[in-house]
């Protein structure tokens, strides 16, 4: 697989961004927390990672030019977006033709404490909801699957969704 330009949308401190940077051509990590962007940038310098850049930004208004990336990746980020369908549309915008999106997020659940504990705006999404977001933005070859089930309460499940521009 050729080295890709990857956008990690909702990157947090960038643990996954740093892992992807080991094989990617370039990774752009986006987060709306100035603290996370500063922390991630410091880790990048400390570890000498020169193909990873952190930027402050919102999932619904990504500071990346249109058609610039090969892969848009959102891991446990979509449930923090005020308008998740707009976040998916932004991922579409920044992708090159033929680019792909990969979303890992919580399946719909009823663990209300997540709103207070983790600032979750949404209590996950069904596979059908995520599929609608992707198809509504224009993605094709959309696939979804439950890829993880917690064995302890609150028994959260993780959905993987992919699509192609």
Regions found by a protein language model. Give the residues of each.
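C-terminal alpha-helical "lid/dimerization" subdomain adjacent to the S-adenosyl-L-methionine
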Residues: 100-157, 162
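Class I SAM-dependent methyltransferase SAM/SAH-binding core
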Residues: 5-8, 12-61
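A short glycine-rich, Lys/Arg-flanked "PGG" loop and its adjoining helix->strand segment in the class I
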Residues: 85-100
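A short acidic, Gly/Pro-enriched loop at the edge of an enzyme's catalytic core
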Residues: 60-71
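A short SAM/SAH-binding and catalytic strip from SAM-dependent methyltransferases
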Residues: 70-83
């Amino acid at each position: 697989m050729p080295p890709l330009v990857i956008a990690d949308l909702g990157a947090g401190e960038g643990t996954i961004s740093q892992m992807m940077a080991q094989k990617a051509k370039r990774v752009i990590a986006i987060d709306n927390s100035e603290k996370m962007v500063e922390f991630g940038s410091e880790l990048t310098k400390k570890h000498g990672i020169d193909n990873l850049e952190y930027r402050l930004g919102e999932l619904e208004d990504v500071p990346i030019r249109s058609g610039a990336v090969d892969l848009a990746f959102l891991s446990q980020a979509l449930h923090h977006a005020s308008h998740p369908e707009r976040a998916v549309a932004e991922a579409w915008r920044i992708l090159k033709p033929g680019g792909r999106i990969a979303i890992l997020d919580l399946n719909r659940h009823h663990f209300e404490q997540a709103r207070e504990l983790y600032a979750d705006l949404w209590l996950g999404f069904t596979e059908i909801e995520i599929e609608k977001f992707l198809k509504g933005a224009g993605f094709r070859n959309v696939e979804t699957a439950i890829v993880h089930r917690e064995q302890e309460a609150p028994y959260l499940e993780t959905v993987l969704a992919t699509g192609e521009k």
